[in-house]
Amino acid sequence: MSTAAPAPLHAPAYGAFLARGFLAWLLIAALETLHGIARTLWLSPLLGDELARRVAVPGGVLIVFLVAWLTVRWIGARSTARLLAVGALWLLLMVGFDIVLAQSLGFSWERILADFDPRRGGLLGFGMATMLVMPWLAARLRGLR
């Protein structure tokens, strides 16, 4: 007979909140892909590709925040540890997604790594790092934490 207390009814099981976090990440990936397409079609011709990539980072961060804001209650992660676990999931999935997408589009490893390297003007690493805290920040601002 187990003496462990059952989880509260309002908190999804560990796998459930991560599964919901994954579904929210799919929305982030879709919106970020559209954001990248729009940047390439409209911003890059005006500013040049390198500057357009830098200028677009705040918009990408805003997309992640809005998805976190809209989905954090549904995801159901309430503790700081679980919220950061969702953020870590988003971060790892998005870094992998970006690298696979860039490789499939024929970008060199030098170009991909430059996007993440602030010494070379890349801000993508900073934008990606914000993903780690976005679920926690959204929960806090919504009064769920």
What are these regions (language model features)?
Residues 137-145:
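Membrane-interface capping segments at transmembrane-helix boundaries
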Residues 18-22, 26, 54-58, 83-88, ...:
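Hydrophobic alpha-helical transmembrane segments
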Residues 50-51, 113-125:
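Short aromatic-rich membrane-water interface segments that cap or initiate transmembrane helices
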Residues 1-15:
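Short, Lys/Arg-rich, polar N-terminal cytosolic tail immediately upstream
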Residues 61-69, 124-138:
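Hydrophobic cores of alpha-helical transmembrane segments in multi-pass inner/ER membrane proteins
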Residues 17-58:
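N-terminal first-folded block
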Residues 38-47, 106-116:
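Membrane-interface helix termini and inter-helical loops of multi-pass transporters
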Residues 49-54, 76-92:
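Internal alpha-helical transmembrane segments of multi-pass membrane proteins
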